[in-house]
């Protein structure tokens, strides 16, 4: 088994020694890059773009050509699973995802397809294989999925929302139906992540974007319990290598201890949680990822550098920190500000004695 030339990201996720804090950026492949916008002109339909392995591979690689990032994340979308289940999904340019046949009854849930993941989503696995070959072991590749709760939000609401009131009301009105939907999504998500690992993903991540909308009791019942099931059933070793698992719940800081106990290796933090306090709360149970406010990337390099250093200082000495944003990068972010962020993290991250890589030993 060939070693990664840069396994800093994986070592940090496993809380092994690192020479500096690794950095990558959520949505690092995307609309803030002019080369991505040019690539999208070839296939304006977003889902068609995602389903073209060569284009998804190219989009994945683009940010690594500009910035010395410590990980790549496969270009895709969290709604690939609902799409494969037969919902009528459209990505509207100014609206976002629209599902024309929302799932709001037991009959709707029963009509959903449970496809063979490796066939229905083969385009994603082909994209991963192409990307792994193109990366040539330079950095790890992250695979990902949306959390069952977050996917269910879109499927029941029918479109994006700030509150997902329809989805939340359904929890109270038809809890059994919602649990059935979540279990179907969980079963497919486990198969989906395992197939990504089989195709070559080195790390997998679950985005629970809308978990923070729930009450503490409902969060555990309708989101975290399903995340824990995924953690228990996703492959965590491959060819003698550990496959780290990251959970990210936006606005989930109040449940940090519960998330840390759910079976993941690392917890992503949004910008509303102090990372130093978070580290004290979780101890050595998990690594932490985050958590710069994406809005600061719309300011200036000096402010960005100061904010990045503040986060690094707040986390403190030792491994177990992956620097990232607290959410996805805004499409209007200037490229020079991204470069300033990556440079600041690399220059100012607290350095430890450079270790001998233990990941592939």
From Swiss-Prot:
> Which reactions does this protein catalyse?
uroporphyrinogen III + 4 H(+) = coproporphyrinogen III + 4 CO2
Q: Which Gene3D superfamilies match?
A: 3.20.20.210
Which residues are tagged with the site Transition state stabilizer? 77
* Matching Pfam families: URO-D
Return the InterPro entries for the record. UROD/MetE-like_sf, Uroporphyrinogen_deCO2ase_HemE, Uroporphyrinogen_deCOase
Q: Which GO terms describe its molecular function?
A: uroporphyrinogen decarboxylase activity
Top-level taxon in the UniProt lineage: Bacteria
Its EC number is: 4.1.1.37
What GO biological process term is on the record, naming one? heme biosynthetic process
Q: Name one GO cellular component term.
A: cytosol
Instruction: Using the UniProt record, give the first listed, main subcellular location.
Output: cytoplasm
Query: Where does this polypeptide localize?
Result: Cytoplasm
Q: In which pathway does it act?
A: Porphyrin-containing compound metabolism; protoporphyrin-IX biosynthesis; coproporphyrinogen-III from 5-aminolevulinate: step 4/4
Residues recorded as binding substrate, renumbered to this chain, are 27-31, 46, 77, 154, 209, 327
Query: Which key words tag this protein in UniProt?
Result: Cytoplasm, Decarboxylase, Lyase, Porphyrin biosynthesis
> Which residues form each disulfide bond in the chain?
none
Function, as annotated, reads: Catalyzes the decarboxylation of four acetate groups of uroporphyrinogen-III to yield coproporphyrinogen-III.
Task: Report the HAMAP family cross-referenced here.
Answer: URO_D
Q: Give the protein family.
A: Belongs to the uroporphyrinogen decarboxylase family.
- Quaternary arrangement and interactors, per the entry? Homodimer.
What name does this protein carry?
Uroporphyrinogen decarboxylase
Q: Which organism is it from?
A: Coxiella burnetii (strain RSA 493 / Nine Mile phase I)
Which lineage do the record's taxonomy fields give for this organism? Bacteria, Pseudomonadati, Pseudomonadota, Gammaproteobacteria, Legionellales
């Amino acid at each position: 088994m060939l070693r990664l030339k840069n396994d800093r990201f994986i070592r940090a996720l496993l809380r092994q020694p690192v020479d500096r804090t690794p950095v990558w950026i959520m949505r690092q492949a995307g609309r803030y890059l002019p080369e991505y916008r040019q690539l999208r002109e070839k296939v304006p339909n977003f889902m068609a773009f995602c389903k073209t392995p060569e284009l998804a591979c190219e989009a994945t690689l683009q940010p690594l050509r500009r910035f010395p990032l410590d990980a790549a994340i496969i270009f895709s979308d969290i709604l690939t699973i609902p799409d494969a289940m037969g919902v009528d999904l459209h990505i509207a340019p100014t609206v976002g995802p629209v599902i024309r046949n929302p799932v709001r009854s037991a009959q709707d849930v029963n009509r959903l397809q449970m496809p063979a993941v490796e066939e229905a989503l083969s385009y994603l696995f082909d994209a991963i294989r192409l990307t792994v070959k193109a990366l040539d072991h330079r950095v790890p590749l992250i695979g990902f999925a949306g959390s069952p709760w977050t996917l269910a939000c879109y499927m029941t609401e029918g479109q994006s929302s700030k509150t997902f009131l329809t989805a939340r009301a359904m929890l109270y009105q038809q809890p059994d139906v919602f649990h059935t939907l979540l279990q179907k999504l969980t079963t497919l998500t486990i198969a989906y992540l395992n197939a990504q690992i089989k195709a070559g993903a080195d790390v997998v991540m679950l985005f629970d974007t809308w978990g923070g909308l729930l009450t503490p009791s409902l969060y555990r019942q309708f989101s975290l319990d399903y995340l824990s099931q995924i953690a228990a059933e996703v492959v965590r070793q491959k060819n003698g290598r550990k496959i780290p698992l990251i959970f990210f719940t936006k606005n989930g800081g109040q449940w940090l201890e519960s998330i840390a106990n759910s079976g993941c290796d690392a917890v992503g933090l949004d910008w509303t949680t102090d990372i130093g306090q978070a580290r004290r709360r979780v101890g050595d149970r998990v690594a932490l990822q985050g958590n710069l406010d994406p809005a600061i990337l719309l300011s200036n390099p000096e402010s960005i550098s100061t904010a990045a250093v503040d986060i690094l200082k707040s986390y403190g000495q030792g491994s177990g920190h992956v620097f990232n944003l607290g959410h996805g990068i805004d499409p209007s972010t200037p490229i020079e500000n991204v470069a300033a962020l990556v440079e600041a993290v690399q220059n100012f991250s607290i350095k430890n004695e450079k270790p001998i890589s233990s990941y592939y030993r």
